[in-house]
Amino acid sequence: MFVTAYLAFIVLAGLCVALEITARRLTLSQATQTAVANPAFQRFQKLFLKAYLLALWADWLQGPYLYKLYRHYNFLESQIAILYVCGLASCVLFAPVAGWLPQFLGRRQTCLLFCLAYSVCCITKLSQDYFMLILGRVLGGLSTSLLTTTFEAWYVHGHVDIHDFPKEWIPVTFGKVANWNYGLAVGAGLVANLFAEWLGLGPVAPFLLAIPSLAACAWFVLSEWGQEDKQEGMNGDKNAPLLNSLNTPKLQLSARARFWRSCVDGLRCLLSDRRVMLLGGVQALFESVLYIFVFLWTPVLDPHGPPLGIVFSSLMAATMAGSTLFRLATSAPYRLQPGHLLCLAILLAFFSFFMLTFSTVPGQPRPRESLLAFLLLELACGLYFPAVSFLQGRVVPVERRAAVLAWFRLPLHLLACLGLLALHGEVSGSGAGEAGSGTRHMFAGCAGMMLAALLAVISLFTVGRNDADLRLEGPKLEGEI
């Protein structure tokens, strides 16, 4: 498996480079060229990317060796499943808080809170106390919720309200973030492998390595973003005198009222539009399975001795390849529809889990087939996320999108928690641990969920058979990744 992992990484890295070069030749849009030529936009974009990419780097560093760390501390698989459930449950609980905190504390201050909470989360990994590790997972859930909302909220506010750049340029920045994000994920796996295995520092090393990145992120937010916020105070907020005349309790009440109204409006939008509900069902089914996969890939492969950091980088390279294939497939020469690519992604994911039910038979494991199945699943993820993002942009109203997506994430995390709890119960009941059939049964269940997701997609396109919103027309949509 050692040689197989390195060979897979080399092949996938070469494939990603070739696909990216081809995609850039075919998909450079006019809006991208205009934005690149604007020096003020470039300066603001770099200001945002410095801090945000450091935050993403710190997050990715913790991916390859989390399960390995808990096993290093001699916890059972059932105990580790509970730790993962605590992290997912905290994401559910803190998701509303993550949307409200920027209004209460301010966007920049909430980004600083993210850096602090995630740093403490990393420090807890030094402890072998189970309850301290649970606390770390709870803080990790809070940090993940803040990472996915607060940084982007600061950027969009500055882009639209302060600098008054065209809204069409926002996808240019987030397209760049997406491209960098995959590269950071691949690099994080390599660096984590270097420190944990080549230098012999153990599975806790990547978590400690993330702390300086979080500190650097906090420094950029304090210093450079602070200067930006001062500029906003001088030039950007013409309503400041009026706002200052109001008392603080009323402002806080208004923020709460806006938050709850957005939640109710999002739920009403979800229940009133069948297209939105079906798309939410697809997202809940597909992405909850991904959370289960994140838990299971390490115990499936680790007993056979692969370098986990290299395997992680290979998985992320497969996702990057899928994302680039999406850009190519929807570009002018091919014009494939995102809905068709979404169906393809779900079929690939189903086939991957179907393979895994046979490659993880107790007593007869086939780790190379399992690795291939995991790589196919990540390729499917690369196709899935931009396709779903396109459909969300077409069927969910812009003003309600954040609230609707928050409601999407609720069943997503609940399904993942139930899956991990079911695995915990089966492992605990059989006493077989990784040698039992719980993992195989879980993969079979995931395959069933993929079939349900496929039925939901078919229903979505049956409902919207003649709906132009579900189709890509004209020039390729800007910001698709």
UniProtKB/Swiss-Prot annotation:
Keywords: Cell membrane, Ion transport, Membrane, Transmembrane, Transmembrane helix, Transport. Belongs to the major facilitator superfamily. One of its GO terms (cellular component) is plasma membrane. GO terms for molecular function: molybdate ion transmembrane transporter activity. PANTHER family: MOLYBDATE-ANION TRANSPORTER, SAM (S-ADENOSYL METHIONINE) TRANSPORTER. This is Molybdate-anion transporter. It comes from the Eukaryota. Its main location: membrane. Mediates high-affinity intracellular uptake of the rare oligo-element molybdenum.
